[in-house]
């Protein structure tokens, strides 16, 4: 089994992605972390130029992945533009399963809904979603929520 964890490398999102990597590796599941990075680093500018954003290292094929997990911070009540561009640029996804997660300190807004909508336009199968909310840094106790999220969807992969 092959898993791709694609995430915007900011704060708690990175910690959650790395936690997924640990969990999968302990279960002897192949996992690859993919930080979603665009040439434009300034998030405010990303919102203004989303349609023109270019990924630094686009993925050509996702056929080898049984599951793709996509993570974003919640900024301005939605997913970051770089993640949206990543989803839009994905090749055919009908044979892949997806899980989505978002992190934020307040209301979840439309982050998961936005990512789900972009994936549904590609006929993707989303098996689970989760918003991790905390005003504090994720510690081992908070990361147990990540483990619980994994447990929810592990039988579907």
Residue spans for each PLM region:
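Charged helix-capping and loop-helix junction motifs
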Residues: 82-88, 112-116, 142-147
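Structured loop/turn residues at beta-strand edges in well-structured enzyme cores
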Residues: 63, 93, 124
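Glycine-rich phosphate/pyrophosphate-binding loop and the adjoining helix
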Residues: 56-58, 125-157
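N-terminal beta1-alpha1-beta2 submodule of the flavodoxin-like/Rossmannoid cofactor-binding fold
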Residues: 1-71, 77-89, 150-157
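Alpha-helix N-cap/loop-to-helix initiation residues
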Residues: 13, 76, 107-108, 139
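Short, glycine-/small-residue-rich phosphate/pyrophosphate-handling segment
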Residues: 99-134, 141
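Short, conserved loop/helix-junction motifs that constitute active-site signature segments
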Residues: 89-95
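Generic structural signal for helix capping and beta-alpha/helix-loop junctions
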Residues: 40-43, 108, 136
